[in-house]
């Protein structure tokens, strides 16, 4: 009879050594990096446990420092890390990156048009469609929420104040900044841009939530409609 060595799974570990159980008992923040990674990977190989595989993977990428920059090909080239595990790792890294980015955005203080443009420039300058985004601020001009209100050619009949201010009320915003991109790379405001801005400005004055600015994003450049005198 041939005996096959099967991969050692998390359920095969003694209870006190199981990363999942340890996470529940002591909290995720108290687990080592290789334990968290083992929870993602779930299984090792027939020659090593999932914890050993996790340790070896981290050593291959100098810990977490280079792991976040690894490609699917680089990850899957590591023995024991196939395509599925590589994709799981990349998905987890990307989620962590987005959460970190969101946390930074929500503490970002906007004191000038440059601050607002710097916050969104890299995300918006290469978009192939127009995205109309609102940055909602508290009384200290900190960004408390960012929402894409509309995607497509900007039109005053499409960008309805109701959608903009509904989110402002929901977030208890004191003020807001509108941002949208020009896929052409030229941030010169159009007539529609100006009409949308004035309409939202007037509505904001009526209900007490001020439109501070409307930024048009181009390729590494932007225009502030407030600085242009449209607010």
Curated annotation (Swiss-Prot):
GO terms in the biological process aspect are:
proteolysis
Q: What InterPro entries does UniProt report for this protein, alphabetically?
A: MPN, RadC_JAB, RuvA_2-like, UPF0758, UPF0758_CS, UPF0758_N
Expression triggers:
Transcribed under partial control of SigM ECF sigma factor.
Transmembrane helix among keywords: no
Motif JAMM motif at which residues?
Answer: 180-193
Signal peptide coordinates: none
What domain of life is recorded for the organism? Bacteria
Question: Which UniProt keyword terms apply here?
Answer: Hydrolase, Metal-binding, Metalloprotease, Protease, Zinc
What's the protein name?
UPF0758 protein YsxA
Q: What is the lineage of its organism?
A: Bacteria, Bacillati, Bacillota, Bacilli, Bacillales
């Amino acid at each position: 009879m041939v005996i096959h060595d099967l991969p050692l799974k998390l359920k095969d570990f003694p209870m006190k050594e199981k990363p999942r159980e340890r996470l529940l008992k002591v909290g995720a923040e108290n687990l080592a990096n290789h334990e968290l990674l083992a929870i993602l990977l779930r299984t090792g190989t027939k020659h090593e446990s999932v914890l050993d595989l996790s340790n070896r993977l981290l050593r291959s990428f100098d810990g977490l420092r280079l792991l976040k920059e690894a490609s699917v090909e680089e990850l899957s080239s590591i023995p024991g890390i196939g395509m599925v595990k590589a994709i799981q790792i990349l998905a987890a890294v990307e989620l962590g990156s987005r959460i970190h980015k969101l946390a930074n955005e929500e503490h970002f203080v906007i004191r000038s048009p440059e601050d607002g443009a710097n916050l969104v420039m890299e995300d918006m300058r290469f978009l192939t469609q127009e995205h109309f985004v609102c940055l909602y601020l508290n009384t200290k001009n900190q960004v408390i929420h960012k929402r894409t209100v509309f995607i497509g050619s900007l039109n005053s009949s499409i960008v309805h104040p109701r959608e903009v201010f509904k989110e402002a009320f929901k977030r208890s915003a004191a003020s807001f900044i509108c941002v949208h991109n020009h896929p052409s790379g030229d941030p010169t405001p159009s007539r529609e841009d100006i009409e949308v801005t004035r309409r939202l400005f007037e509505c904001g004055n009526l209900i007490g939530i001020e439109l501070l600015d409307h930024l048009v994003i181009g390729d590494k450049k932007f225009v502030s409609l407030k600085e242009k005198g449209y607010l």
